């Protein structure tokens, strides 16, 4: 193990649920506005998960008022309050970039039984 791995190990979160691309998540993010802090929920489909260790990130996509919105979060970020898995998706790809081009029912992901 490298020296950096020992340093990174202290920053890893233990409360991260098991999720994969295709799953629908509620990501509760801490937002600081002035001197106030509040929790904002970002609900969407995981389209990718990449990296490893402290550098691991995932991207969540949702359609808000007809506009596609994607947000990339570090898995072990202190700005994430917690992550809820809403549904499990049944997909055959690790990166779901093709969802960007689909509209309506075509962009729907089958739920895993």
Swiss-Prot record:
- Taxonomic superkingdom: Bacteria
Q: Name one GO molecular function term.
A: structural constituent of ribosome
Q: Which InterPro entries match?
A: Ribosomal_bL19, Ribosomal_bL19_CS, Ribosomal_bL19_sf, Translation_prot_SH3-like_sf
A Gene Ontology annotation in the biological process aspect, one of them, is: translation
Gene3D superfamilies named among the record's database cross-references: 2.30.30.790
Q: Which GO terms describe its cellular component?
A: cytosolic large ribosomal subunit
Give the record's keywords alphabetically. Answer: Ribonucleoprotein, Ribosomal protein
Q: What does this protein do?
A: This protein is located at the 30S-50S ribosomal subunit interface and may play a role in the structure and function of the aminoacyl-tRNA binding site.
Q: Which family does it belong to?
A: Belongs to the bacterial ribosomal protein bL19 family.
Tell me which HAMAP family the record gives: Ribosomal_bL19
The entry's protein name is Large ribosomal subunit protein bL19
Q: Which organism is it from?
A: Nocardia farcinica (strain IFM 10152)
């Amino acid at each position: 193990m490298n020296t950096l791995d020992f340093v990174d190990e202290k920053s890893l979160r233990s409360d991260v649920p098991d999720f994969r691309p295709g799953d629908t998540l509620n990501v509760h993010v801490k937002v600081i506005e002035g001197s106030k802090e509040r929790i904002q929920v970002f609900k969407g489909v995981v389209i990718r998960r990449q990296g490893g260790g402290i550098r691991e990130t995932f991207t969540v996509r949702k359609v808000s008022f007809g506009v596609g919105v994607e947000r990339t979060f570090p898995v072990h970020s202190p700005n994430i309050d917690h992550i809820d898995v809403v549904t499990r998706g049944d997909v055959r790809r690790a990166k779901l970039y093709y969802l960007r081009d689909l509209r309506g029912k075509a962009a729907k992901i089958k739920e895993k039984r």
